[in-house]
UniProtKB/Swiss-Prot annotation:
Keyword Cell cycle tagged: no
Residues involved in substrate binding: 8-15, 21-22, 60, 87-90, 98, 114-115, 183-184
Name this protein carries in UniProt: 2,3-bisphosphoglycerate-dependent phosphoglycerate mutase
Protein function: Catalyzes the interconversion of 2-phosphoglycerate and 3-phosphoglycerate.
Source species of the chain: Chlorobium luteolum (strain DSM 273 / BCRC 81028 / 2530)
MF terms (GO), sorted A to Z: phosphoglycerate mutase activity
Pathway: Carbohydrate degradation; glycolysis; pyruvate from D-glyceraldehyde 3-phosphate: step 3/5
PANTHER family named among the record's database cross-references: PHOSPHOGLYCERATE MUTASE
NCBIfam families associated with the record: pgm_1, PRK14115.1
Pfam families per the UniProt record, alphabetical: His_Phos_1 (PF00300)
Positions bearing the site annotation: Transition state stabilizer: 182
Length: 247
């Protein structure tokens, strides 16, 4: 039996302000830093020791991973950063307040943009300052790989090569792996692992800063999955994510 630990970054400043964040590189709040440290304590208490960790190229995930490894006394651990673990790109919604956007376009439309599988938000133009094409961390990417907007289907498509070519082989070789990423890049992985339908994925919400443990068989099929920590607090955190875009 193999354990894989998934963790959404701690609360960011734009989580606190209820904004669509996407690829914008916003930092953690003080609460987010505490969530990250607490996640490390929960993982350590579970007796899990990592061999390798993966995260995005966005500081809210990177800093969360640092805090986790610090609490586990594993700051030396090999860490691999990839844009393929970035949050989905919210296009022209990036930076907008979710509640205000719901008031303007309607809760139903915003829910489709936030949680549907194959409907992306309105796209950015390449001349928009929010388009990440000029960011040096994406310098090695082809222009066509840098998104103007993404739905979850797009996020799955750009994440799965990293899973199949890099992460899954590490797990199969016996390595204990941590993936610290974002709500939608983790939804992409959970959809794949649990074979969740395109309709049912709409209802999946992942809270910030709470470790999600998968127990996998030798074929990397899930035997079970569970959040660490107080389960009532987990339910409240999941419900809070679900309610973010209510008008």
């Amino acid at each position: 039996m193999i354990k894989l630990v998934l963790l959404r970054h701690g609360e960011s400043q734009w989580n606190l302000e209820n904004r669509f964040t996407g690829w914008h590189d916003i930092d953690l709040t003080e609460r987010g830093r505490k969530e990250a440290a607490n996640a490390g304590k929960l993982i350590r208490a579970e007796g899990i020791v990592f061999d390798v960790a993966y995260t995005s190229v966005l500081k809210r995930a990177i800093r969360t991973l640092w805090s986790v490894l610090d609490e586990m006394d594993q700051m030396w651990l090999p860490v691999h950063k990839s844009w393929r673990l970035n949050e989905r790109h919210y296009g022209a919604l990036q930076g907008l307040n979710k509640t205000e956007t719901s008031q303007k376009y309607g809760e139903e439309q915003v829910l489709v943009w936030r949680r549907s599988y194959d409907t992306p938000p309105p796209a950015l133009g390449r001349d928009d300052e929010r388009w990440p094409g000029a960011d040096p961390r994406y310098r090695g990417m082809a222009e066509g790989e840098i998104p103007l907007s993404e739905c979850l289907k797009d996020t799955v498509a750009r994440f799965l090569p990293l899973w199949h070519e890099t992460i899954a082989p590490q797990i199969r070789s016996g390595k204990s792996v941590a993936i610290v990423a974002h709500g939608n890049s983790l939804r992409a992985l959970v959809k794949y692992l649990d074979n969740i339908s395109e309709d049912d994925i709409v209802g999946l919400n992942i809270p910030t800063g709470i470790p999600l443990v998968y127990e996998l068989d030798d074929d990397l099929k899930p035997l079970k999955s569970y959040y660490l920590g107080d389960q009532d607090a987990v339910k409240q955190a999941v419900a809070a994510v679900a309610g973010q875009a209510k008008a």
